[in-house]
Amino acid sequence: MFQSGDYNVHFIDEHPELFKLKKDKDRGTKLLRYIADVTVNGYNGHKEEVPTFEPIIMPPNLPGAPAAGTKQKLDELGPEKFSKWIQEQPTVLFTDTTWRDAHQSLFATRLRTADMARVAGRVAKGLPNLFSLECWGGATFDVAYRFLHEDPWERLRMFREQVPNILLQMLLRGSNAVGYTSYADNVVREFIRLAGKNGIDVFRIFDSLNSLDNMKVAIDEVRNQGKVAEVALCYTGDILDPRRDKYNLAYYVNVGKELAAAGANILAIKDMAGLLKPQAAYNLVSALKDAVDLPIHLHTHEGSGNAIYSYGRAVD
């Protein structure tokens, strides 16, 4: 083509307008750069304002020792009979997630041990009827080390000392334990042993892909340690939409049956993205109660604004 003269290399020479560059007017990027600079380097020549905080109103510290609770009931009955005891209760049981998933979701797991220690004993006395306190596992373990420069084991021992009457619960990522890779079976087993020894009573075990193979070792070791294996199925999709037939009601019922057969003491529904609609919660809990003879524990998130209604329908 060059030999025939159809193409040449004179385009730039013949188009001088290419060098008439317009001044950049990307104000959005400039603003972002300024914000980033101030965030990282602080104000140049300006005194940063000191934020003012409202005084903290501490919950009342009731006199006397905490009343006996679910911790004593588990120690008395053991995991198997304790599971049956849960099913016999005429009222709904509640887990408080303030010390784990709440601050993990709201501000990157940055709640410090010292702040929780100030109220732990008051919670034990003021809320002795709670089923459990989710206070460990998930991202709390690595964040304590990497960002807060704290010892998560000391935090757990503090909880056990100050809350002797309520079950302490953690989130365990199956073969990933509290890390972000797969660990050898003996590592997972030893971690569970030490977690139980230092205070954990309920292990909520899950795998992001609902793979039972990734949860079997954890379930087995939790049972070996005489603790409660609350095994979770992760919810996604929309079981109310017939067009979404991969993760439908039959899929979750089948997963629930597999988890029950694997040794779960409690079956959890882990709605980590807050996708479970109210009517879907009713349908799913109803189907699982018909399929397995286990307590059902629902965990969801409020991102959609539907969580309280989903809980209400699940209770129905």
What residue ranges belong to the model's regions?
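Non-catalytic terminal accessory/regulatory regions of metabolic enzymes
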Residues: 1-178, 183-185, 193-196
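Alpha/beta enzyme core
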Residues: 32-35, 89-94, 111-135, 145-167, ...
